[in-house]
């Protein structure tokens, strides 16, 4: 995914854990990768994390595929109780362009709006250690006959 926070109007990304959107068992087998194309600063909406939150969070709130609509498209919804994070525990993580941030599937993170005169571009994607890992059948994103998730390597 390519993220582009435009100057002055690039919005916030609300606090969340990636496990809400990508449920696997065991959950520690999902990892986000975030690569800034521009320096990510306090002013242009750098990432914020709650340190150590991956050790205490669980996935009780999920974005899931429920069933197909009459047109055959999947119906997506949130299930469960959303975690409420203490906002004063978030710590900003300004980072230089070209760096790499690894994001555990249970760590609480967010970003603030871009209030600067400069854009903030970033690439992000998620990887799953598929070895001995179950991909939940109600995840919003599912492989199909036409599109299989690519393997980065084989064990």
Indicate residue ranges for each PLM-predicted region.
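Conserved double-stranded beta-helix
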Residues: 1-49, 54-55
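A generic fold-level signal
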Residues: 7, 25-28, 42, 85-87, ...
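Short histidine-centered beta-strand/loop micro-motifs
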Residues: 13-18, 22-25, 92-94, 112-116, ...
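Glycine-rich, charged/polar anion/phosphate-binding loops
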Residues: 17-20, 34-35, 87-89, 107-110
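Glycine-rich loops and low-complexity Gly/Arg-rich segments
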Residues: 22-29, 38-40, 57-62, 72-76, ...
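Intrinsic-disorder/low-complexity, polar/charged segments enriched in Ser/Thr/Lys/Arg/Asp/Glu/Gln
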Residues: 30-32, 90, 100, 122
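Double-stranded beta-helix
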Residues: 40-107
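Non-heme Fe(II)/2-oxoglutarate
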Residues: 58-66, 97-102, 106-155
